[in-house]
């Protein structure tokens, strides 16, 4: 049976892992076994946090909208309810951007929501 020489592949595999761990502190950037373990954890964290980022931004947008809405004298949930009743299809990202950058347009949307809430029948 022929002898299998794997030195090149093994060195490449180790080099790739050590390059991925190049910014880590201490042994995690120099020793292959520690670096491999840390790279695996890092990849898992980055996968998890790419999913979590979406919720984080949604929460940030809601906080910004709520702060701007309360400055206009209406709460966040009443604003969203009024915009839905008025048929205004603006997502939270756009609303938060308007609240920060264009207060006049945001105030107009708040007025639209108030009008829709005052016209809407109340359920009892």
From Swiss-Prot:
Record flagged with keyword Protein biosynthesis: no
KW RNA-binding (keyword) present: yes
MF terms (GO), sorted A to Z: rRNA binding; structural constituent of ribosome
Function, as annotated: Binds directly to 23S ribosomal RNA and is necessary for the in vitro assembly process of the 50S ribosomal subunit. It is not involved in the protein synthesizing functions of that subunit.
The protein, known as: Large ribosomal subunit protein bL20
One GO process term, biological-process aspect: ribosomal large subunit assembly
Superkingdom of origin: Bacteria
The family this protein is said to belong to: Belongs to the bacterial ribosomal protein bL20 family.
Annotated PANTHER family: 39S RIBOSOMAL PROTEIN L20
Native source organism of the sequence: Acidothermus cellulolyticus (strain ATCC 43068 / DSM 8971 / 11B)
